[in-house]
């Protein structure tokens, strides 16, 4: 009986300690795909300062690219191919990684808040690649 009791305590401890506290929501918060829960400062539509026609849109439920129209990655037909969303928020830096088709392709972007109405897209070295202004 003592062995069963110790086993149950160990099992509960292992299960309780295996839950992730990575900052992403396991159930996606209010997001449409599990794991998607962007920081409030990035919610909105952001237009590229150079092209003035391309950009990104972030809502509580979706992440969209604006290029000759809008392509949303977490809704519609695209939601069916999304396997997993990983994200990391470190202060004013937000990284989103969308894994599609069980890992056969990955979309990853890192953004940094510069001001309330300005963000930058960072390259792999952490350098500013493009800047974006929040659409009013």
What function would you assign to each model-found segment?
Residues 4-5, 14-41, 136:
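Bacterial Sec-dependent N-terminal signal peptides
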Residues 11:
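Structured alpha-helical
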């Amino acid at each position: 009986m003592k062995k069963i009791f110790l086993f149950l305590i160990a099992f509960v401890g292992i299960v309780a300690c295996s839950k992730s506290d990575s900052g992403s929501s396991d159930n996606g918060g209010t997001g449409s795909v599990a794991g998607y829960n962007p920081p409030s400062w990035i919610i909105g539509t952001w237009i590229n300062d150079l092209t003035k026609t391309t950009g990104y849109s972030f809502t509580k439920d979706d992440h969209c690219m604006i290029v000759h129209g809008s392509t949303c990655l977490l809704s519609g037909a695209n939601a069916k191919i999304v396997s997993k969303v990983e994200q990391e928020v470190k202060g004013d830096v937000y990284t989103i990684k969308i894994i599609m088709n069980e890992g056969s392709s990955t979309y990853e972007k890192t953004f940094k808040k510069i001001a309330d109405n300005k963000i930058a897209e960072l390259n792999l070295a952490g350098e500013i690649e493009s800047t974006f202004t929040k659409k009013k």
